[in-house]
Amino acid sequence: MDMNEHRNRRLKLIMISATFGGLLFGYDTGVINGALPFMARPDQLDLTPVTEGLVTSILLLGAAFGALLCGRLADRYGRRKMILNLSFLFFLASLGTALAPNVFIMAVFRFLLGLAVGGASAMVPAFLAEMAPHEKRGRMVTQNELMIVGGQFLAYVFNAILGVTMANTGHVWRYMLVICAVPAIMLFASMLKVPESPRWLISKGKNSEALRVLKQIREDKRAEAECREIQEAVEKDTALEKASLKDFSTPWLRRLLWIGIGVAIVNQITGVNSIMYYGTQILKESGFGTKAALIANIGNGLISVIAVIFGIWLVGKVRRRPILLIGLAGTTTALLLIAIFSIVLDGSMALPYVVLSLTVLFLAFMQGCVGPVTWLVIAEIFPQRLRGLGSGISVFFLWILNFVIGFAFPILLSSVGLSFTFFIFVALGVLAIGFVYKFMPETKGRTLEELEEHFRSRHDHNTPEQSVIEV
């Protein structure tokens, strides 16, 4: 085996190991979709629309704080160490949810599981962005998105198998939830073989160790040049005080933070997680039975996987901004059609199949365009010293909005119906398109250090009135 092949295999091992965090993220957020109908039974947890929303969304609230907390801790203790600790939390919380005797205990462990999900959502993309060469960064970071939707797909498949074969077993939802403990063990075992981020090592003065890591995944001369480039960027940062919220009072950093938060919000106001968490209920609302809805929901998971594979190829070829704009136009149109047909075909036998087809179309645009670019841009735009904090804050807002949507959706669905609920998401989708067109910068084709220098120097030389669209 020649050295280049060895380095590529090493880089692939790093990517696969870290993205088990994405798989856990996906399974834990997707499994509730099929578990809820069984969990809600009177002889189980006896859930109401409000407690359904609570059990679903408390994980998302935990994820918001997990992203914020883990971002700071990772800047202090390292990306790899945080991911290892998160694997233990995934394992513990998975067992807790599977064994929960009542709604209160379930909510506690779902919150703890959320801390792990949120931490992984912030840490894994940042870790991959720091390990990847710039020409592979887009594909490597979006592999995490593939693992997220792969985890959701596996959750839907296991839900359907268990839900159909054990439909008369009330506690079948416990088997659905405990499966998540397996990838948690795999994440821990695989991350033991992965090195720390060289950018984090240099930020802590461990330059020789960072160079050794870079030489494992880069050609020697390139590793040395990249090491010097990172050191120069870190030296500029160390002239400043320790990373804190005060840093974002600097105009160019404040602008990047608002862009990061904005892109995170854009991801959620598409309404994607109303479908990912409540797809089974949406299909039941449109006319499917419980078993048919569980099986049909596999289609949503499968198209998500196919779309992300396409998205990984796309981000390697096309700029970030047009991908995101096209994706948002597609998701907004699909939701508009669901809302319209829910009125026009109300009571028709065709409605459930039309809704299923349109949710598949929605997810094709969402997972192929919107999702990959969202996580990639959040991982790219912040400078090294503030990457953990900036990513953590951005992802915090993503999860807070996710929590609001996850909690409110079943209540909206039961009170105002499917069509009006989706009309709300259509209006928000139009606002999202406007934000991306006006404010989101282009980040493709530059190293993380080049992006940092570009954003910094652009603010120094440009007038405040100039739009970020020019970046």
Curated annotation (Swiss-Prot):
Main localization category: membrane
Compartment(s) where it occurs, according to its Swiss-Prot or TrEMBL record: Cell membrane
Keyword hit for Transmembrane helix: yes
A GO MF term: D-glucose transmembrane transporter activity
GO biological process: D-glucose transmembrane transport
Membrane topology label: Multi-pass membrane protein
CDD domains: MFS_XylE_like
InterPro entries found in the cross-reference section: MFS_dom, MFS_sugar_transport-like, MFS_Sugar_Transporter, MFS_trans_sf, Sugar/inositol_transpt, Sugar_transporter_CS, XylE-like
Name assigned to this protein: Putative metabolite transport protein YncC
Gene behind this protein: yncC
